[in-house]
Amino acid sequence: MSGFLDDYSESLEQFESFRADDQDVHQHITSGEHDPVDGDSNVADAEQDDLLGLDTQIKLTKRKPTARVDNNRIFSQKGLGYLLKNHHKLSKTIQRNDKQFEEKSKNGRVHRAQKFQHEYDNLSSVLQFYQLWCHGMFPKANFKDCVHLLRLLGAKSPRLRLYRRELIEQEIIKLKEASGIIVEQEERENTLQAGNIIVDAENQETEDIIEASNINNVVSTETSGETNGLFVGDNDDDDLYHTPPPPETVSPNIAVSSIVVSKPDLADITGVSDTDTTIVDKSEVNIQPIAIPVLTQVSDLTNTTNNESDHDAFSDDDDFYASLNETFVHQERPPQESDYDAEEEVMKEMGL
């Protein structure tokens, strides 16, 4: 009986242990963990599947930033700010050394070695000042490397070149103001303001003149309605090919016929007709010369032609009448017959 109980207790213990193992396996499956029985095989399968290393985790370490001389470092308080703040100390040191050297030179003759020593002291002060500055700005580099890095930055950085140019221009302006070449800033601003006021006044006067001229042009075009004759008018109804009528001129034939001089009739001269057979005494015959109005008619003709040609600037009649005037002016009068010839003609006609 005792043996049976022992066997029953052992089997019960085995069942409980199996049940506990089953619960553990169930927990592993639900939690996503690998089965402890098949752990080695699962790891081997995972290594074969992850040949490219996509699922492996890599630990990344952050690199320390490399110290270098850049714009941020050079424009910081330890950079150019330190030089602008403390450069007057270096100037005072050099002035003090110069003053001591002048006092020594007044007492007696200065040797050449003393001059070199004075210059060496000044250069040593400058070198120590810049060594201290470089060490505070870039501690990891010695002075020689720091100078090399600063030269490279000055050649590459546009911001640093512009800043250096501004400093140089400011110093030049200060020297010019001290020497009286240029006026100070306040006087310069006042001069510029006065100049701007004058320029504005001149511009305003010019604008007023232009506006007045434009108004006059508008009024003149509205009243006239036409252009000045040099260009085609704005009116579309104008005839582009319209020509002015020709001026009234005197016909050349009429002018010539009006000034032709006819031979004087004997009856007009003697006062005796052809039918009168009365003997006329020579003493009773009174021959009066007839005035030939050649010049008067020609002058009247030229005056009329000139007055008519004045209306036409491109008239061709001027040449014709000028030549005609010259012809009749220079025409010689026919020689008058003497009294003796006239008497002979009268006697012949009477049959004597």
Swiss-Prot record:
Keywords: Cell cycle, DNA damage, DNA repair, DNA replication inhibitor, Meiosis, Nucleus
Cellular localisation: Nucleus
Biased composition range(s): Basic and acidic residues: 16-37
GO BP term, example: replication fork processing
GO MF: DNA binding
Keyword DNA repair: yes
Region described as Disordered: spans on this chain: 16-44, 330-352
UniProt keyword DNA damage, yes or no: yes
GO cellular component assignments: replication fork protection complex
Highest taxon in the source lineage: Eukaryota
Major subcellular site: nucleus
Family, as annotated: Belongs to the CSM3 family.
Quaternary state and interactors: Component of the fork protection complex (FPC) consisting of TOF1 and CSM3.
PANTHER family recorded: TIMELESS INTERACTING-RELATED, TIMELESS-INTERACTING PROTEIN
Protein purpose: Forms a fork protection complex (FPC) with TOF1 and which is required for chromosome segregation during meiosis and DNA damage repair. FPC coordinates leading and lagging strand synthesis and moves with the replication fork. FPC stabilizes replication forks in a configuration that is recognized by replication checkpoint sensors.
UniProt-recorded name of the protein: Chromosome segregation in meiosis protein 3
Originating species: Scheffersomyces stipitis (strain ATCC 58785 / CBS 6054 / NBRC 10063 / NRRL Y-11545)
Gene expressing this chain: CSM3
